[in-house]
């Protein structure tokens, strides 16, 4: 039986990691051992931040809604409570978009929330 050398397999594995590390600074894109660690860490950051992105956007929407509703004379918590009582089911993403781009429409929604209280 012939001897199997692992040169081809190792080179393919190294090339794969170095390709993933393309664009990294210094040894992180050139040295296999360092590049492998950098790619693993990048994957961990990506996994974590895909979840954090959802939280951060929700926080941003709430901040925008709060600012716009206070400009119309109502705090965020009272505004959301008023929406629930009046049966308006618009999610925070859409409310934040209205607050930024359609100020008149948002003001009308705030008036409905005020009336419900």
From Swiss-Prot:
Cellular compartments per GO CC: ribonucleoprotein complex; ribosome
Gene3D superfamilies per record: 6.10.160.10, Ribosomal protein L20
Pfam families: Ribosomal_L20
UniProt xrefs under InterPro entries: Ribosomal_bL20 (IPR005813), RIBOSOMAL_L20_CS (IPR049946), Ribosomal_protein_bL20_C (IPR035566)
GO biological process, one term: translation
SUPFAM superfamilies attached to this UniProt entry: Ribosomal protein L20
Annotated family: Belongs to the bacterial ribosomal protein bL20 family.
Protein name per the record: Large ribosomal subunit protein bL20
Species per Swiss-Prot/TrEMBL record: Chromohalobacter salexigens (strain ATCC BAA-138 / DSM 3043 / CIP 106854 / NCIMB 13768 / 1H11)
Gene behind this protein: rplT
């Amino acid at each position: 039986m012939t001897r199997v050398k692992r040169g081809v397999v190792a080179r393919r594995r190294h090339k794969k990691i170095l390709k993933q590390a393309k664009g990294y600074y210094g040894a992180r894109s050139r040295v296999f051992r360092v590049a492998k660690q950098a790619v693993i860490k990048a994957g961990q950051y990506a996994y974590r931040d895909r979840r954090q992105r959802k939280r951060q956007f929700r926080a941003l929407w709430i901040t925008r809604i709060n600012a716009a509703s206070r400009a119309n004379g109502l705090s965020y918590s009272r505004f959301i409570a008023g929406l629930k009582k009046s049966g308006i089911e618009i999610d925070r993403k859409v409310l934040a978009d209205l607050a930024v781009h359609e100020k008149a429409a948002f003001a009308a929604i705030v008036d409905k929330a005020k009336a419900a209280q």
